[in-house]
């Protein structure tokens, strides 16, 4: 115990003495420097004092710039949920079809046969013609005798209807036949088209009218197309009639 106290007291005295020595040397150095400065300081001569006006605003601290609005952070996209593998639906069990009894056809009842009743023929009584006896005196009449109606009577000639047929009037210079429609040819359909038209001063066909078409909406278009190419003599005529016949096999005929 005594040794411990000895070493402890010795350990505390050395740092204390070292600290006191350092502080004393610092104080002595400061006193020496201050005394030397007081000795060396020269005398200050009186000099005129220059006064300048200074704008305090120039030395004012600059106002802080307006803080820029901070961009809001974009929301992160939510992660898509992983698809859950759904179990395949169980196949529906179809019920077995129940056999339906087929009803027997009902036989129609036989219609009663009507018996024809023959009416008895009624015989007309014979009427005997009575002939008047001839007179001895001849009968005279002032009226002229009637002409027998059995004699042939000459009728006046009928006026010819212009343009009823192409046999009279302007002759055809170019009259091509229409083509057989492919659809009608494939189906094996035949028919005819009856058209009425006029001819102008240049021999061209105008004012085409469909009078009859069998079957309808099958051959009319081909007939109208080919009639645009027909040429006649340069004589005007009206109400010409032509019949175009389409036969199976792709042939056409015109009257």
Swiss-Prot record:
Sequence repeat segments: 72-73, 74-75, 76-77, 78-79, 80-81, 82-83, 94-95, 96-97, 98-99, 100-101, 102-103, 104-105, 107-108, 109-110, 111-112
Biased composition regions of type Acidic residues, renumbered to the chain: 71-89
Source superkingdom: Bacteria
Membrane topology qualifier: Single-pass membrane protein
Cytoplasmic compartment residues: 1-10
A GO BP entry: transmembrane transport
Compartment list: Cell inner membrane
UniProt similarity note: Belongs to the TonB family.
UniProt name for this protein: Protein TonB
Recorded name of the encoding gene: tonB
């Amino acid at each position: 115990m005594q040794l411990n106290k000895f070493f402890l007291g010795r350990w505390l005295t050395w740092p204390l003495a070292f600290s006191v020595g350092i502080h004393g040397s610092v104080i002595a150095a400061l006193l020496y420097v201050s005394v030397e400065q007081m000795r060396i300081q020269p005398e200050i001569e009186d000099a005129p004092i220059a006064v300048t006006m200074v704008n305090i605003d120039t030395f004012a601290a600059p106002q802080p710039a307006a803080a820029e609005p901070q961009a809001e952070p974009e929301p992160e996209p939510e992660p898509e949920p992983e698809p859950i593998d759904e179990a395949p639906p169980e196949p529906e069990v179809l019920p077995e079809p129940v056999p339906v009894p087929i009803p027997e056809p009902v036989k129609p009842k036989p219609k009663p046969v009507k018996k024809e009743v023959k009416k008895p023929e009624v015989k007309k009584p014979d009427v005997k013609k009575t002939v008047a006896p001839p007179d001895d005196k001849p009968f005279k009449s002032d009226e002229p005798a009637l002409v027998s109606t059995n004699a042939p009577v000459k009728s006046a000639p009928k006026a010819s209807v212009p343009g009823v047929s192409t046999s009279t009037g302007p002759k055809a210079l170019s009259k091509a036949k229409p083509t057989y429609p492919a659809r009608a040819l494939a189906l094996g359909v035949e028919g005819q088209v009856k058209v009425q038209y006029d001819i102008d001063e240049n021999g061209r066909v105008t004012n085409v009218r469909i009078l009859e078409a069998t079957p309808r909406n099958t051959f009319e278009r081909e007939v109208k197309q080919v009639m645009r190419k027909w040429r006649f003599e340069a004589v005007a005529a009206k109400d010409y009639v032509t019949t175009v016949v389409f036969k199976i096999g792709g042939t056409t005929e015109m009257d």
